[in-house]
């Protein structure tokens, strides 16, 4: 993300030419200069778009008011220095006093959106310019996360400004921030090196190597310490986090001593484990030999047994196949003899099956005829009932229709009377509801008018009035009577026409059912045609069974004729002839008899030849068996010779070659023995030299340590233990023979003890001096090109050359130790090789001696297996000749069988020549089939329509005339009835008007008239109600009568449908039977059945006779068939066995070859043992193996799986598992061989040598408690001296009332007791260190618990506690004290000091930590690198001017840079000050910065 913002002003115009960092920094001085930070660059920070702060060599001050950006600038520096988000937390801008803080660790709010940079520019001691920084970017989301990526740039010129590198100028007042990818491209274009780091550890490793940070930060713990130091410096005061763990900051971890202890413990542990393994291997040697021997016998015997069985199975399968093929050949020859009788038997069987089918068909036909006759009787009976019911049903239908008409008329009259009663009741109600006469009269008048209007509308009379209403009423009454008479006439005519129409419709429906839909006019012609053909079709249907039987007989005879023709054709085709007459067939019969006699004689000659060859084969077999008996011993001798050839790499042609090689092997063994002894002596010398140089304090004689402790002094080598490897030759030559001297404080006090020394080196040097502040000014020395001249005394000079291999100082000793250890490892490897060569020669000579005694007489004899192969070739030739004879014999048999087969065909053809001669048989069959087709069609027609034709025949004459006027009469009747109803309605409306004539007149006496009118209406109502009740009774009677008639009709209809349904079912069943019966049908069916039964009995008698003859002839063929089947079954079973064994054998071979064990399993001598002997050998070995592997779960499971005889590959897997187990158990790192047997033999001697060697090494590596105590005391004393040196640099520091600062280091009482117990002679503690089951760490932990039983050790193990006790830092207590006013020395705590004093004291402690880190890392840093020193101080206003001057003086004295922040009232005289002012112009906010050089600075 790039942004374009307005560039900020850098410096004031008059100050642009001023350089903050002097140019002298970049010049190469005579000595090594300390690295310095040149500048800090902030890009796109809050208030700083592109700002570079040049840092002063001493103090850089950020001055400004609150919010000016001082803390932001320091935060940018800290972020670039420690870019670890898990540590960064700027508390002064987040939550004051909070321990956790917000999710924004004070960094997110200091950045602006987009790409941001914080870059440090430094120049190290090598005058290399390094730009190290971070790219920061806000991550979207409410968590306020920041993404950080670290990078570095090297190779830029000094003149290039970091701001110009990180931004791109867009215009005069605008610039764009480059992304990380764009920055990389730009740097590479300029020829510099850009590197991005994927972890903070890599970033800090680069900064350490280039001298930007004081120590290597390997882990997050180291980064946390560094950050806490920077944080304590930034916020000022005494940091409790540092003072509480001051040991971790000031005291370096003595990794060398600790690692030496761990290495010694590991070596001891490994030696003890190796010794136990050696003892176990020696005790298991006999078991291993027994295991490998029994495993080989167990697997190899089964392996060779399977190989022998596979070969035997193959040979057996080949013999079975040979026997099978021979039997099949015999079967092919014998089958020709059985063809005739087999064919005849087959034909008789087929004929019998056909007769059985015909007989069964005849029986079924007889049953069908009987069933059809019974159905026919029932059909006739049901047909009569149906006809009778049809007549009754038609009569009853007429009665029901008449009753229905009467009921409808009565209902119509009843409805008319009901309407009239309702009207009269309405009038009465209207009259009764009238309140006065006028209302009644008005109401009556309105109703009369409504009735008159209704009559006008209904009658269509516009001039209708009260006066002429009666005239019209009479006229309509006359019309109603006329229409009633017409309806009665039409009903009478309708009843007469309906009877004629019913018969016509019935006959027409029957014709349509048979002939399909036809016009009514063509119904009579179609009926005549059907009735005319009906008798002929009926007769043809009756003849169908006879025609079918006749056709069956003709077809059977025709099939016999075709079969005979086919046999004759096959015979001519096989024989290649065209015989047709009986004479020709008889002549050919005689020729075949002569041919059979000749073939029989030739067959006898071949039998004699085969017997001679078999005798010769038996002789060769006896010779083969003799060679096979002598082969195993020769194979064993040859295998032994081959093994010796492989091991020696020589080829032996005869016995003398073997003896010469044995003599040469003895000479070679003596030579190797001498070389081995020389290497052993040289290795012992190197071990002694390494042991002397491995002493932690540099003393080569352990007695010097005792003397130094006795005199209260320190070894000179211990004081110079940290000397650099470059200075080691100088100091080694400077002190010469006195390099192993003891430095004591008072020589006079020591002189008194010299006389009482018992055990001391021959030359003991003592030097007087302070061990805590010793220097090399003891002698007056002058360094020359190749050595050092030392003025020992006025009259004595000593010149010592620089040693080629200096041993003064730990670094020099470690370097030389590395070389000696490499040389010793090389000597050990050579010694092991020579020892192995000696053992190899001894073992090879022993094996040759054994070979000479057992196998030398047989090894060089001719190969018996080669002779056996030659014998096998001869046997195979004889077998081939026997196979050829067998083939010829089979061909003779085939010819003989063919001749016999032709004889059988001739015997069968001669009796059937008469049938073949009948040529008219096919025409008869076709003619009979056509007649049967016609009869079957008529039979189907009669079956479908016979009943319909019988019903049509009596009523067919009704079709001659069609009653077409029936429909017209029916329409006239309905029309007349409608007119009658309309006339009745009109007459009723006029009658209503007439009844209301009085309502049209007006009378004066209304009441009288009303009463009279009411009386008339009541009278009329009573009359009409009486008529209605009478009419209701009449309707009820009509309904009952109609219901009775209808019930009878329904019963008749139901009975008719039932009878008719049963009739249809019977007719369908008869139709399904597919035949038409008559009086003679039963007799014909019985005669046909009896005839077929007679024919079937005759055929069965003939077939029984033929089968008896066939059984006699087939007895030999059946025996041969059983023989073939047995041979085939045996062959297939054997072949399956071979195939299955092949699959398993392939798995075994592949497994053995891939595992390189095939050669070990192929024991050729086992091939001559029987299967029982091999199985017995395998079973014996299995019993022994079960006992041998009983304690090994893996081998026990593998052995159990291998016992499955169906899977021989499991035995090979077991063999491989045993060899793999042996390879794992033996010491493959000592003896290199692929053969476990050879390795076991080699290990026996090699392990006995290692036993002595490891026992001696364990004695050398044994750690004594006294030596541990001495090492601890020396290390503690050295660190105490170093702390005293640090205190010298803090003596003149003063802040306020604090006049001095110092570090106090003491040994803890509990650990002092432990040191005394380790170095003392208490016998009660030695049991812990003499226990081989405990390591030294565990022993020292147990001792610590004994001495301090009151201390709770928690859940920690003894090993963990012991490892902590081997760290000298846990023995010390380290505190900071200050000398303050009248109080004297006090412990440095923030509560006892003022703010300024606490800040100054804390800064002093941090300086000590930094200086200690630099010294600690001096050995692992480049010799030409002195790291940068820079600390921070925020809110420096809390210090007074004197304290600030003290800080400046401290920075100048310690060559340290300081970055402080202060309000505007702080203006130090030295260093560089930046005035920061935050300004807002428009919508943009930026910090205006002005850089000022201190006015007290020296040019």
UniProtKB/Swiss-Prot annotation:
Its main location: cytoplasm. SUPFAM superfamilies: P-loop containing nucleoside triphosphate hydrolases (SSF52540). Residues 696-813 are annotated as: Flexible hinge. Signal peptide: none annotated. One of its GO terms (cellular component) is cytoplasm. ATP binds at residues 64-71. GO terms for biological process: cell division; chromosome condensation; chromosome segregation; DNA replication. One of its GO terms (molecular function) is DNA binding. InterPro entries: MukB, MukB/SMC, MukB_hinge, MukB_hinge_sf, MukB_N_dom, P-loop_NTPase. The keyword Cytoplasm applies. Residues 335-501, 540-622, 666-695, 865-940, 1007-1053, 1100-1143, 1238-1294 form a coiled coil. Gene3D superfamilies: 1.20.58.850, 3.40.1140.10, MukB, hinge domain (3.30.70.3500). Belongs to the SMC family. MukB subfamily. Plays a central role in chromosome condensation, segregation and cell cycle progression. Functions as a homodimer, which is essential for chromosome partition. Involved in negative DNA supercoiling in vivo, and by this means organize and compact chromosomes. May achieve or facilitate chromosome segregation by condensation DNA from both sides of a centrally located replisome during cell division. The hinge domain, which separates the large intramolecular coiled coil regions, allows the homodimerization, forming a V-shaped homodimer. Homodimerization via its hinge domain. Binds to DNA via its C-terminal region. Interacts, and probably forms a ternary complex, with MukE and MukF via its C-terminal region. The complex formation is stimulated by calcium or magnesium. Interacts with tubulin-related protein FtsZ. NCBIfam families: PRK04863.1. This is Chromosome partition protein MukB. The lineage of its organism: Bacteria, Pseudomonadati, Pseudomonadota, Gammaproteobacteria, Pasteurellales. The gene is mukB.
């Amino acid at each position: 993300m790039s942004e374009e913002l307005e560039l900020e002003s850098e410096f004031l115009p008059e100050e642009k030419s001023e350089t903050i960092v002097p140019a002298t920094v970049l010049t190469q001085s005579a000595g090594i200069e300390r690295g310095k930070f040149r500048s800090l660059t902030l890009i796109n920070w809050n208030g700083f778009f592109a700002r570079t702060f040049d840092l002063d060599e001493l103090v850089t001050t950020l001055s400004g008011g609150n919010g000016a950006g001082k803390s932001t600038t320091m935060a940018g520096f800290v972020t670039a220095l420690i870019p670890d988000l898990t540590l960064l937390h700027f508390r002064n801008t987040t939550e004051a006093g909070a321990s956790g803080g917000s999710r924004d660790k004070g960094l997110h709010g200091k950045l602006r959106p987009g790409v941001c940079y914080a870059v440090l520019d430094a120049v190290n001691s090598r005058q290399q310019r390094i730009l190290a920084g971070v790219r920061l970017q806000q991550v979207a989301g409410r968590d306020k996360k920041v993404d950080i990526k670290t990078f570095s740039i090297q190779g830029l010129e000094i003149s290039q400004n970091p701001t110009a590198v990180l931004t791109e100028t867009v215009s005069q007042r605008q610039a764009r921030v480059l992304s990380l990818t764009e920055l990389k491209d730009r740097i590479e274009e300029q020829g510099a090196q850009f590197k991005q780091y994927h972890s903070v550890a890599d970033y800090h490793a680069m900064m350490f190597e280039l001298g930007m940070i004081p120590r290597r930060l390997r882990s997050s713990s180291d980064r946390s310490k560094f950050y806490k130091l920077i944080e304590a410096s930034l916020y000022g005061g005494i940091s409790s986090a540092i003072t509480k763990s001051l040991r971790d900051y000031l005291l370096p971890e003595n990794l060398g001593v600790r690692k030496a202890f761990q290495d010694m413990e590991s070596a001891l542990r490994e030696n003890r484990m190796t010794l136990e393994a050696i003892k176990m291997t020696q005790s298991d040697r006999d078991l291993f030999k027994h295991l490998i021997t029994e495993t080989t016998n167990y697997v190899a015997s089964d392996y060779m047994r399977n190989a022998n069985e596979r070969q035997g199975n193959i040979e057996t399968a080949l013999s079975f196949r040979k026997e099978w093929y021979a039997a099949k050949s015999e079967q092919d020859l014998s089958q020709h003899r059985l063809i005739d009788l087999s064919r005849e038997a087959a034909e008789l069987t087929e004929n019998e099956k056909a007769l059985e089918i015909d007989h069964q068909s005849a029986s079924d036909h007889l049953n069908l005829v009987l069933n059809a006759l019974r159905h026919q009787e029932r059909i006739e009976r049901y047909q009569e009932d149906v006809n009778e019911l049809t007549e009754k049903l038609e009569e009853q239908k007429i009665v029901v229709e008449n009753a229905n008409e009467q009921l409808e008329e009565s209902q119509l009259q009843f409805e008319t009377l009901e309407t009239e009663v309702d009207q009269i009741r309405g009038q009465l109600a209207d009259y009764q509801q009238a309140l006065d006469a006028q209302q009644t009269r008005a109401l009556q008048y309105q109703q009369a008018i409504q009735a008159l209007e209704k009559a006008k509308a209904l009658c269509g009379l516009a001039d209708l009035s009260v006066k002429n209403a009666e005239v019209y009423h009479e006229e309509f009454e006359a019309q109603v009577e006329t229409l009633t008479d017409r309806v009665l006439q039409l009903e009478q005519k309708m009843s007469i026409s309906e009877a004629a129409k019913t018969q016509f419709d019935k006959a027409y429906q029957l014709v349509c059912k048979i002939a399909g839909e036809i016009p009514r006019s063509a119904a009579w012609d179609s009926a005549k045609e059907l009735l005319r053909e009906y008798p002929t079709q009926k007769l043809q249907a009756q003849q169908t069974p006879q025609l079918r039987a006749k056709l069956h007989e003709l077809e059977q005879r025709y099939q016999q004729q075709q079969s005979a023709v086919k046999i004759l054709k096959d015979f001519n085709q096989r024989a290649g002839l065209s015989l047709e007459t009986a004479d020709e067939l008889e002549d050919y019969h005689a020729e075949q008899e002569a041919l059979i006699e000749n073939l029989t004689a030739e067959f006898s000659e071949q039998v004699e030849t085969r017997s001679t060859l078999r005798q010769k084969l038996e002789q060769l077999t006896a010779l083969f068996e003799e060679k096979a008996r002598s082969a195993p011993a020769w194979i064993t001798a040859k295998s032994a010779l081959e093994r010796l050839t492989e091991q020696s790499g020589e080829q032996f042609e005869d016995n003398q070659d073997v003896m010469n090689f044995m003599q040469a092997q003895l000479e070679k063994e003596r030579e190797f023995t001498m070389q081995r002894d020389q290497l052993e002596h040289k290795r012992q010398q190197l071990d002694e030299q390494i042991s002397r140089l491995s002493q932690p304090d540099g003393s080569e004689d352990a007695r010097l340590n005792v003397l130094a402790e006795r005199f209260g002094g320190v070894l000179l080598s211990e004081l110079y233990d940290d000397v650099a490897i470059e200075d080691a030759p100088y100091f080694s030559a400077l002190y010469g023979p006195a390099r192993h001297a003891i430095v004591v404080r008072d020589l006079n006090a020591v002189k008194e003890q010299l006389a009482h020394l018992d055990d001391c080196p021959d030359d003991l040097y003592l030097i007087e001096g302070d061990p805590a502040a010793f220097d090399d000014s003891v002698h007056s020395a002058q360094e020359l090109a190749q050595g050092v001249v030392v003025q020992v005394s006025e009259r004595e000079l000593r010149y010592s050359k620089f040693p080629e291999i200096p041993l003064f100082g730990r670094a020099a000793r470690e370097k030389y130790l590395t070389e000696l250890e490499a040389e010793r490892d090389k000597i050990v490897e050579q010694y092991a090789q020579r020892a192995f060569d000696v053992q190899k020669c001894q073992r090879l000579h022993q094996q040759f001696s054994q070979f000479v005694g057992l196998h030398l007489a047989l090894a060089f004899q001719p190969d018996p297996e080669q002779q056996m192969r030659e014998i096998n070739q001869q046997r195979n030739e004889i077998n081939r000749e026997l196979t050829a004879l067998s083939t010829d014999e089979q061909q003779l048999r085939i010819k003989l069988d063919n001749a016999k087969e032709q004889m059988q065909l001739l015997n069968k053809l001669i009796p059937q020549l008469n049938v073949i001669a009948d040529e008219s048989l096919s025409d008869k069959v076709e003619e009979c089939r056509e007649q049967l087709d016609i009869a079957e069609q008529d039979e189907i027609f009669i079956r479908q329509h016979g009943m319909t034709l019988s019903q049509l025949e009596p009523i067919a004459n009704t079709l001659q005339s069609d009653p077409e006027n029936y429909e017209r009469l029916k329409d006239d009747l309905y029309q007349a009835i409608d007119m009658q109803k309309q006339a009745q309605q009109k007459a009723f409306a006029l009658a209503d008007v007439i009844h209301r004539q009085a309502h049209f007149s007006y009378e004066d006496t209304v009441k009288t008239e009303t009463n009279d009118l009411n009386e008339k209406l009541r009278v009329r109502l009573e009359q009409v109600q009486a008529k209605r009740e009478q009419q209701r009774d009449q309707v009820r009677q009509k309904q009952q009568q109609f219901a009775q008639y209808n019930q009878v009709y329904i019963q008749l209809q139901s009975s008719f449908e039932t009878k008719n349904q049963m009739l249809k079912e019977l007719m369908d069943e008869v139709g399904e039977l597919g035949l038409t019966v008559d009086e003679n049908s039963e007799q014909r069916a019985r005669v046909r059945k009896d005839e077929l039964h007679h024919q079937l009995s005759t055929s069965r008698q003939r077939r029984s006779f033929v089968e008896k003859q066939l059984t006699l002839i087939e007895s030999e063929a059946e025996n041969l068939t059983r023989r073939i089947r047995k041979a085939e079954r045996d062959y297939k079973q054997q072949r399956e066995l071979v195939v299955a064994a092949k699959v398993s054998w392939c798995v075994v071979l592949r497994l053995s070859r891939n595992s390189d064990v095939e050669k070990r399993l192929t024991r050729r001598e086992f091939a001559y043992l029987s299967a029982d002997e091999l199985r017995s050998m395998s079973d014996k070995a299995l019993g022994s193996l079960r006992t041998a592997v009983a304690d090994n779960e893996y081998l026990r499971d593998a052995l159990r799986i291998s016992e499955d005889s169906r899977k021989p590959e499991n035995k090979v897997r077991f063999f491989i598992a045993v060899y793999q187990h042996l390879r794992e158990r033996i010491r493959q790192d000592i003896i290199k061989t692929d053969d476990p047997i050879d390795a076991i033999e080699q290990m026996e001697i090699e392990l006995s040598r290692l036993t002595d060697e490891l026992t001696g090494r364990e004695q050398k590596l044994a750690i004594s408690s006294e030596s541990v105590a001495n090492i601890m005391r020396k290390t503690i004393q050295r660190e105490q001296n170093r702390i005293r040196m640090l205190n010298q640099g803090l003596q003149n520091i003063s802040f306020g009332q604090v006049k001095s600062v110092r570090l106090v280091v003491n040994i803890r009482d509990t650990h002092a007791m432990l040191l005394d117990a380790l170095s003392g002679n208490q016998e009660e503690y030695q049991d812990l260190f003499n226990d081989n089951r405990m390591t030294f760490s565990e022993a020292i932990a147990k001792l610590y618990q004994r001495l301090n039983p009151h201390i709770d050790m928690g859940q920690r193990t003894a090993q963990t506690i012991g490892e902590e006790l081997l760290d000298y830092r846990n023995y010390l207590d380290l505190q900071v004290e200050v000398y303050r006013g009248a109080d004297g020395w006090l412990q440095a705590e923030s509560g006892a000091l003022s703010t300024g004093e606490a800040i100054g004291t804390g800064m002093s402690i941090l300086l000590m930590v930094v200086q200690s880190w630099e010294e600690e890392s001096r050995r692992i840093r480049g010799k030409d690198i002195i790291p940068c020193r820079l600390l921070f101080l925020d809110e420096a206003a809390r210090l007074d001017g004197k304290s600030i001057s003290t800080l400046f003086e401290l920075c100048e004295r310690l060559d340290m840079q300081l970055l402080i922040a202060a309000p505007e009232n702080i203006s130090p005289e030295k260093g560089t000050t930046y005035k920061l002012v935050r300004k807002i112009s428009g919508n943009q906010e930026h910090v205006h910065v002005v850089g000022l050089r201190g006015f007290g600075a020296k040019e």
